Regions:
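Residues within the alpha-helical elements of helix-turn-helix
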Residues: 13, 24, 53
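Residue-level signal for the short linker/turn that defines the boundary of a DNA-recognition helix
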Residues: 15-16, 42-45
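Recognition helix of helix-turn-helix/homeodomain-like DNA-binding domains
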Residues: 26-42
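A short, Lys/Arg-rich alpha-helix, primarily the initiator
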Residues: 1-17
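Short alpha-helical "recognition helix" segments of helix-turn-helix
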Residues: 21-22, 50
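DNA major-groove recognition helix of helix-turn-helix
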Residues: 36, 54, 62-65
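DNA major-groove recognition helix of helix-turn-helix/homeodomain DNA-binding modules
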Residues: 45-60
């Protein structure tokens, strides 16, 4: 599967972990792990929450289709 999000990269840049993000969102850490490895994708509402928590724009979390 082609990578769609940059969540793993942004977490590293912000010095945060998937476990931290899961706790903030009230999600299972395995769900966040799937997002980080691009096995699954968060819905748009969750993506907005993630962007807010990490203090980045949504565009920073998504890989451009160029």
């Amino acid at each position: 599967m082609k990578d769609i999000n940059r969540l793993k990269i942004v977490l590293v840049e912000k010095k945060r972990t998937g476990k931290w993000l899961a706790e903030q969102l009230g999600k299972n850490p395995s769900t966040v792990s799937k997002w980080c490895s691009n096995v699954a994708q968060p819905d748009l509402a969750t993506l907005v929450k993630i962007a807010t928590l990490l203090e980045v724009g949504i565009q920073d979390l998504v890989i451009s289709a160029k």
